[in-house]
């Protein structure tokens, strides 16, 4: 193990000088061995020449000073993997932060790993039922696929994510890994208690690097979570990997990139944006041994889906769930836009003709209603043809029927959560399209589970 000295500190970036014949490699982990911050880990990012390496601190650099001794561990950051991590909260270095004693792991893996080779990768067309009507109908998830939840500030990404975790993790008997990347600590805390109350905590590994952490932690915490998920996958399991929020991973990369002195590219993002995203996303894949199904929340800055960060993420996903501020403002939750959301699985050969035609029928009616809105706003409903009036009436029922009470939002809505099976979802929307419920008031369809509940509600009106 070679030893060096701290020569310069600029925020989270620390330069360390080593003897010329013992310069650490890029991504090696270095440790501070003296002073107030003894044990602080630095990750090598660049070799500057003359024995000096530029590193990112995996913790606060307040209290660091020049001249401190640094030792090279000779390997990348190693984190605990395996069943011992289940039910525990860890930080980017895999250290427990839940005050429940040591992890007691039997195995540690480096967070920097190669993506599986083409020959090892596998694809599945098996659907993953979520119990959320709008998702199962319009943008069904594939087992072992990648899903993005796109939305601006405050339209419900985290609530949707928590509902998906609750529905899938409880219905799905496998293991899950949750990586909290640069989000609010309060949400991490809520999530822990939600899992505990649902009795699924012993099947979930939690890794947090939240908003208040230095950029190094936020940049690497997604890899820590992913490494734990890869271990479960390589043991032959089907794993769920949740990331909240991919945008903060990009943002941490932007901060680090600026500190490392790289020239920014479009909108101030790092020039290596596509590569950084690719390095993470290419590892989230299913192999012949097991599968990783990943669900990622993606913050959309200023509701602009063409922003480089969400636009780069789109390319890697199998299904995109787009949350709309317009739908949220109408009080329809989940505020998922059925016209903007899409999935590769929505194909008659995969989901079957009935499901495909029902989903496309719903989208056609909603699209027609969208076109008629201008006419209604200027001339009023009376000027529409009978056929268009019927379309508008059905579209408004469909819109309301796409809403659903969530289990994780029971505290806010006051109504118990509902899980709707795919079969019931298709039957309900098929009935509305066929005109079976034309005589029912549209309010009856708002915030209900299955269609029977809507009929029951209509009878009471």
Curated annotation (Swiss-Prot):
CDD domains: ATP-synt_F1_beta_C, ATP-synt_F1_beta_N, F1-ATPase_beta_CD. It catalyses: ATP + H2O + 4 H(+)(in) = ADP + phosphate + 5 H(+)(out). The keyword Secreted does not apply. GO terms for molecular function: ATP binding; ATP hydrolysis activity; proton-transporting ATP synthase activity, rotational mechanism. ATP binds at residues 151-158. One of its GO terms (cellular component) is plasma membrane. Transmembrane segments: none annotated. It is a peripheral membrane protein. F-type ATPases have 2 components, CF(1) - the catalytic core - and CF(0) - the membrane proton channel. CF(1) has five subunits: alpha(3), beta(3), gamma(1), delta(1), epsilon(1). CF(0) has three main subunits: a(1), b(2) and c(9-12). The alpha and beta chains form an alternating ring which encloses part of the gamma chain. CF(1) is attached to CF(0) by a central stalk formed by the gamma and epsilon chains, while a peripheral stalk is formed by the delta and b chains. Produces ATP from ADP in the presence of a proton gradient across the membrane. The catalytic sites are hosted primarily by the beta subunits. This is ATP synthase subunit beta. It comes from Colwellia psychrerythraea (strain 34H / ATCC BAA-681) (Vibrio psychroerythus). The lineage of its organism: Bacteria, Pseudomonadati, Pseudomonadota, Gammaproteobacteria, Alteromonadales.
